[in-house]
Amino acid sequence: MGVDLSDINDSLFKLSDKLSNDLAKQRNLCIVKEPSFSIEEHIKCFTTCINTYKPFSCLKHANWALLLAKKKSDTGLIGYCQSLRGLAYYLLEQYQSSAICFGFALKHLKKEDLTKWQVQLDSMLTIVHEQQNQDTSSLIPDECPNIPELEAAKIEGDEEFLNMSLKAPEGQIEKNEEKLSNRIRYDWSQTSFSLNIDIYAKKVKDEDVSLLMEKNTLKIEIKLEDGSIFSLVLDPLYEEIVPEKSSFKLFSSKVEITLIKKVSEIKWEALVKSPANNSVNVYAKDSNHSSASGNTKNKAKDWDSLAKLADLEEDEPTGEAALANLFQNLYKNADDDTRRAMMKSYTESNGTALSTNWKDVKSKTFETKPPQGMEPKKF
């Protein structure tokens, strides 16, 4: 599919009359003085727009870069541009379109390019596939957009660029704040004696958290970076907790709440007894015990078996205790001759030798032979 690069430049400069001087300076971050754009220049513009969070402009430059890559028939570059489209759609919260573009990217990448990008692409595909249920977009992108669609999208994108650059109306600010709150997700897991809830909110300070824990209730409010409030109310809890022993910790990427069960060994099937009582300001819980707006798979994890295994491992002796335990087990299950051999060799050598063969031991005297680098001392 061919493209007249002069049309691209003309369309860009037709919009200059709509921009104020300040906006024109911002816009110049994504244009060049030459009469046409190259693929590299579109990719640079994409990077600039993504750093300033302008997803419509990101999609515009990714689409034009893809057309130029198609013209060159460079499959590796085509795959890379498709991944840029996928990222742009992801920023626009059009997750189904994003997944399709990442699929195009995987199809076009060469083997060596695929190896380099596989982890990132697989990671993004996992995220967007899990968010497809939240996708309200009716747009399903073609593998390569046509010129009229690009022109229309480009103008719409630039108008969006203007709207994002200018001060948003008061109602739009409230809408954006609500959308940021919608991105907060949480999940939970449990052991036989505790229940852990992770709320994935970044850079939360202690003074930004309001927490109430009672035996049947958990209420938490978190002030987010943009000033909006995320709240979670669990009432009544599935089982009673011990508030005075429960706690929370702040990390750079999450708030971690640890609830101590009043009755251990009871497996919680949910956080609350009735889903109708689970009040969250931005989402409801699903059957997988994860937030409906979550970005990753979150299932309630039953750590009971792992916790018991960990307890067993902690109880297992190590070092000298392990050696003494081995000696006791051998001695307990041995016959009389073996026991005599063990006692004679162990005591005569001051614990540096152990033999179970009485025929060899009965006429032998054992010397103290400490490990290399150590010396025996008399007391």
UniProtKB/Swiss-Prot annotation:
GO terms for cellular component: cytoplasm; cytosol; nucleus. One of its GO terms (molecular function) is protein-folding chaperone binding. Residues 346-358 have a biased composition (Polar residues). InterPro entries: CS_dom (IPR007052), HSP20-like_chaperone (IPR008978), SGS_dom (IPR007699), Sgt1-like (IPR044563). GO terms for biological process: adenylate cyclase-activating glucose-activated G protein-coupled receptor signaling pathway; protein folding. Coiled coil: none annotated. CDD domains: p23_CS_SGT1_like (cd06466). Residues 181-272 form the CS domain. Residues 345-379 are annotated as: Disordered. Pfam families: CS, SGS. It comes from the Eukaryota. Residues 292-379 form the SGS domain. Involved in cyclic AMP (cAMP) pathway, possibly by participating in the assembly or the conformational activation of specific multiprotein complexes. PANTHER family: PROTEIN SGT1 HOMOLOG (PTHR45862). This is Glucose-insensitive transcription protein 7. It comes from Schizosaccharomyces pombe (strain 972 / ATCC 24843).
